């Protein structure tokens, strides 16, 4: 997204959720949004093997049987 598109998105989103933003505040939010998008892009570029992926559901291994 370009800076203009991000700013337009921030303005539209603030109206949609009912949060009034002055233009200066909207520009600050757009700046932080751009930085967050850049960080996400950097994370997405790191290759992951299937072993690196998080499991959808955590299921701990059962405890070993104890001899009583």
Swiss-Prot record:
Pathway(s) this gene product operates in, as recorded in its UniProt entry: Xenobiotic degradation; atrazine degradation
Keywords noted in UniProt: Plasmid
GO terms for biological process, alphabetical: atrazine catabolic process
Subunit structure: Heterotetramer consisting of 2 AtzE and 2 AtzG subunits.
Function field: Important for the activity of the AtzE subunit of 1-carboxybiuret hydrolase.
Protein name: 1-carboxybiuret hydrolase subunit AtzG
């Amino acid at each position: 997204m370009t800076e203009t598109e991000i700013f337009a998105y921030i303005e539209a989103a603030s109206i949609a959720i009912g949060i009034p933003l002055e233009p200066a505040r909207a520009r600050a939010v757009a700046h932080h949004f751009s930085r967050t998008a850049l960080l996400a892009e950097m994370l997405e570029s790191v290759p992951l093997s299937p072993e690196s992926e998080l499991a959808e559901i955590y299921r701990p291994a059962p405890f070993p049987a104890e001899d009583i």
